Amino acid sequence: MTPILYSFRRCPYAMRARLALILASKKCELREILLKDKPDEMLKVSSKGTVPVLQFTNKVLDESLDIISWAMESPAPNVHIYTESEELLSLELVYLFDSKFKYHLDRYKYSSRYGTDPGDHQAECKTILENLDKKINPNPWIFGTEISLL
C-alpha cells in the first residue's frame, strides 16, 4: 500500500512534512483535508485530529518531525547529511520556531484573540528571523551550499 498523507495546505507542520517527503523522493497519496471537516478515515487512524498524518499499512506517524525522520532514514539525493553538531543545531532551531517564534507569530497575526499589542510580537518575530539570517549569510542554505531539511 502506498502511504497516505493527510495534510492541510496552509499548516506549517504539514508543509514541512510534505517538503521532507518531496526532498527524500518518497511517494505517498496526498489527501488534502479541511480542518473544519476532518474525514472519518483520518480520525480512525489518528484521534488527535491534527495534520500531518502519514498512514502506512501497519503504522501511523502523526507528528511532522516523525514523518521527517522516517523520510530521511535513507539518504536523499542532493540533500545535505548533517554532522552531529549540525543535527543538534537543527533540532534547536526547530524547537525555537515551534515554541518561541510560533508563540509570537500567533499573537502578532491574531492579536484580537489574545488581547495583545501586535507590534511587540512582530518585533520578537523579526528578531528571531534576523538572527536566522545571520546564520545563513553569505550561504544560500543554513549549512552551506547544499539544501538540508532545515
Where are these regions (language model features)?
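GST superfamily/GST-like fold recognition
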Residues: 145-150
